[in-house]
């Protein structure tokens, strides 16, 4: 008899990947995914701890689930097994049971491969099970083969953890030290997703370009080596990777952008600030001049490359001059798309202990100014595509029956009106007819 599994995923692409793997783990035990939380036998919150008040948002969601559980009890129905997974689970640990005693399982991002055993114990009336172990190779050695196809574009996690210890960030504390997967293990998973219909693979890591796997005869495989290896797979058309750190942009990786046609001309390369003073305070391990040099070398290797980045405004000690340095960097680099946020102190990080916190209204003002600049650049990038013909990978249906959506080599979403759903999963030449801030509109030639 099948049972229903509901997973709510927060945060980054890594969590999306982990959620798919949780489905794959539990499927052999009779659990099938559902989008209806009310009919779920197991409810998993796969949480993110990056943004402000992440833990409180998790507790709020758990409160809503508690009300659902109470309703089920009144109706004489069995309660669902409740699991808190991901980075909030890693950070909060036993505190989750203290504040929400109706939660059954707390499991970290490196140990969720034990979910089948943990759930089985709860079914046998165990209580409050927790697994937050960091055993580097155990996670990937115990994950199953792909059972649920991800579609035309698939994620594969190749690197986890972070050794950089930026002073604003909790990732080193929730994901652990940097660890790279076995290159052949990655290759086998890539073969699987391609055989399942994937045309594009996005390699994931907290610092994916820190990928560094030691193979036989002490050969070290870099991310560039891994990309070259994967590019040999027949029927795999596109390769991407994220998220990268500037100090790990090696010469061979930069040059690969100019020599490997399957490596897409789009790169997300977070810089966070344009001020050398703030970069040092953030412990970013590079200055703005180093970042400019990488950008110049990338554009020499691949002139049409489109760049993306992350920015934090209002880091402690940021002056008006520091913020102007960030605006100057943005204007000099010219991005295709970006993500920008107000600094929020994360408990346990050095930035949270600083006494020179920036008032909220100043952070809001700076974010508004920065986002206006970034949106202008994003719109200009999209408008530059109008009238051109671009190869688009169609990977999903739109909200209208006759609409399908794909993405360009530059990661822009493209909408077309076409009732022929057989185009999904295919790469088609599309003439771009219209551009907006967040998408393009086109027609098939």
UniProtKB/Swiss-Prot annotation:
Keyword terms, alphabetized: 4Fe-4S, Cytoplasm, Iron, Iron-sulfur, Metal-binding, S-adenosyl-L-methionine, Transferase, tRNA processing
Cofactor note: Binds 2 [4Fe-4S] clusters. One cluster is coordinated with 3 cysteines and an exchangeable S-adenosyl-L-methionine.
Domain Radical SAM core, residue spans: 148-380
Protein name, as recorded: tRNA-2-methylthio-N(6)-dimethylallyladenosine synthase
A GO cellular component annotation in the UniProt record: cytosol
Enzyme Commission number, as recorded: 2.8.4.3
Recorded catalytic activity of this chain's protein: N(6)-dimethylallyladenosine(37) in tRNA + (sulfur carrier)-SH + AH2 + 2 S-adenosyl-L-methionine = 2-methylsulfanyl-N(6)-dimethylallyladenosine(37) in tRNA + (sulfur carrier)-H + 5'-deoxyadenosine + L-methionine + A + S-adenosyl-L-homocysteine + 2 H(+)
Gene name of the record: miaB
NCBIfam families associated with the record: miaB-methiolase, MiaB/RimO family radical SAM methylthiotransferase
Compartments where located: Cytoplasm
One Pfam family matching this protein: TRAM
């Amino acid at each position: 008899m099948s049972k229903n599994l509901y997973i709510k995923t927060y945060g980054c692409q890594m969590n999306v990947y982990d959620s798919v793997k949780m489905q794959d783990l539990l499927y052999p035990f009779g659990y099938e995914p559902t989008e209806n939380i009310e009919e779920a036998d197991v409810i998993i919150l796969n949480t993110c701890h990056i943004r402000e008040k992440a833990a409180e948002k998790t507790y709020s969601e758990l409160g809503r689930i508690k009300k659902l559980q109470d309703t089920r009890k009144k109706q004489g129905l069995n309660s669902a097994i409740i699991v808190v997974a991901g980075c909030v689970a890693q950070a909060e640990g036993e505190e989750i049971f203290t504040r929400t005693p109706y939660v059954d399982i707390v499991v970290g991002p490196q140990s969720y491969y034990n979910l089948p055993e943990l759930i089985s114990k709860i079914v046998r009336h165990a209580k409050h099970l927790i697994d937050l172990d960091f055993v580097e190779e155990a996670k990937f050695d115990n994950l199953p083969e792909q059972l649920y196809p991800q579609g035309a574009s698939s994620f594969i996690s190749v690197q986890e953890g972070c050794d950089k210890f930026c002073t604003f960030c909790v990732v080193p504390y929730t994901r652990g030290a940097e660890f790279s997967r076995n290159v052949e293990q990655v290759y086998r998973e890539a073969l699987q997703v391609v055989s399942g219909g994937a045309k594009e693979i996005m390699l994931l890591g907290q610092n994916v370009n820190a990928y560094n796997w030691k193979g036989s005869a002490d050969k070290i495989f870099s991310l560039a080596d891994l990309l070259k290896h994967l590019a040999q797979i027949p029927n795999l058309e596109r390769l991407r990777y994220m998220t990268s750190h500037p100090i790990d942009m090696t010469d061979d990786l930069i040059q690969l952008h100019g020599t490997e046609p399957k490596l897409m001309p789009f790169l997300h390369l977070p810089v966070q600030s344009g001020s050398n003073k703030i970069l040092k305070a953030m412990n970013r391990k590079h200055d703005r001049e180093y970042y400019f040099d990488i950008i110049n070398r990338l554009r020499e290797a691949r002139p049409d490359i489109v760049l993306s980045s992350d920015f934090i405004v209002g880091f402690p000690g940021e002056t008006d001059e520091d913020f102007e340095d960030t605006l100057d960097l943005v204007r000099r680099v010219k991005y295709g798309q970006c993500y920008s946020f107000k600094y929020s102190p994360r408990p346990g990080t050095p930035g949270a202990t600083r006494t020179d916190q920036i008032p909220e209204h100043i952070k809001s003002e700076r974010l508004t100014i920065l986002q206006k600049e970034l949106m202008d650049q994003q719109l200009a990038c999209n408008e530059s595509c109008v009238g051109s013909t671009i190869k688009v990978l169609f990977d999903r249906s739109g909200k209208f029956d006759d609409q399908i959506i794909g993405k360009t080599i530059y990661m822009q979403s493209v909408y077309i009106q076409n009732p022929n759903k057989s185009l999904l999963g295919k790469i088609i030449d599309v003439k771009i007819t219209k551009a907006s801030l967040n998408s393009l509109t086109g027609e098939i030639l």
